Swiss-Prot record:
Gene it is expressed from: pcm
Annotated compartments: Cytoplasm
HAMAP family: PIMT
Catalysed reaction equations from the record: [protein]-L-isoaspartate + S-adenosyl-L-methionine = [protein]-L-isoaspartate alpha-methyl ester + S-adenosyl-L-homocysteine
Name the UniProt record assigns to this protein: Protein-L-isoaspartate O-methyltransferase
Length: 223
């Protein structure tokens, strides 16, 4: 895991960030480690300037190309689920770099993140942001996220920031034994889902957790 370098980075007031953390606590996020990551990560840097004043609202916000920056609750919840189920994951695959905000949270929590994004301009911006924050433990790929990144697998954990209609088998096969997948699943009605690969019997245990709303996991790439 890498630590953020915040020298020269404008931070909003501690009070504003504390209010966000209080809202996350009220919504059921309990991991102190995850709450500290959210509190100390400058979310406004992951938005265009016109929307940066809304960065610490618990809301999803547009980042262009029909994509969104997930609301802080969802980022915190998915990170909490991933870390809780995987224990101490070293190698994590992220499907959908997007703005880089979830990537940034993961990179502070695990040894290395591999992040796949189908929209190149979004990933290029995310790379710049994370480099500016001193995070060097992320490897990026411009590709169709539905295929994962088999050359780099297996992974201790996989997190998807976009929703397929059904869980891609390719992602399941890239889980290490006892690895976990945290993914929203569905079209009109989506459910946040946790899949654990049972290392002894090599079977997949699926838990449906809560209703969510994500952008769909689309195929192909955009330059």
């Amino acid at each position: 895991m890498d630590r953020l370098k915040l020298e020269g980075v404008g931070m909003t007031s501690k009070r504003t960030r504390d209010r966000l953390v209080e809202r996350l606590l009220e919504q059921g996020v309990t991991s102190q480690f995850v709450l500290e990551l959210i509190a100390n990560t400058p979310r406004h840097l992951f938005l265009d300037e016109a929307l940066s004043h809304r960065a610490y609202e618990d809301a999803s916000l547009p980042i262009g190309f029909g994509q969104t920056l997930s609301q802080p609750y969802i980022v915190a919840r998915m990170t909490e689920i991933l870390l809780g189920a995987a224990g101490d994951p070293k190698r994590v695959l992220e499907i959908g770099t997007g703005s880089g905000y979830q990537t940034c949270i993961l990179a502070q929590a695990v040894e290395h993140v591999w992040s796949v994004e189908r929209i190149k301009p979004l990933q290029d911006k995310a790379k710049q942001r994370l480099r500016h924050l001193g995070l060097n433990n992320v490897t990026y790929k411009h590709a169709d996220g539905g295929f994962g990144w088999p050359e780099q697998g297996p992974f201790d954990a996989i997190l998807s920031a976009a929703a397929p209609r059904d869980i891609p088998k390719s992602l399941l096969q890239q889980l290490a034994h006892n690895g976990v997948l945290v993914i929203p699943v569905g079209a009109d009605e989506q459910v946040l889902t946790l899949v654990i690969r049972d290392g002894e019997e090599d079977k997949f245990i699926t838990q449906k957790l809560e209703p969510v709303k994500f952008v769909p996991l689309l195929s192909g790439v955009t330059r």
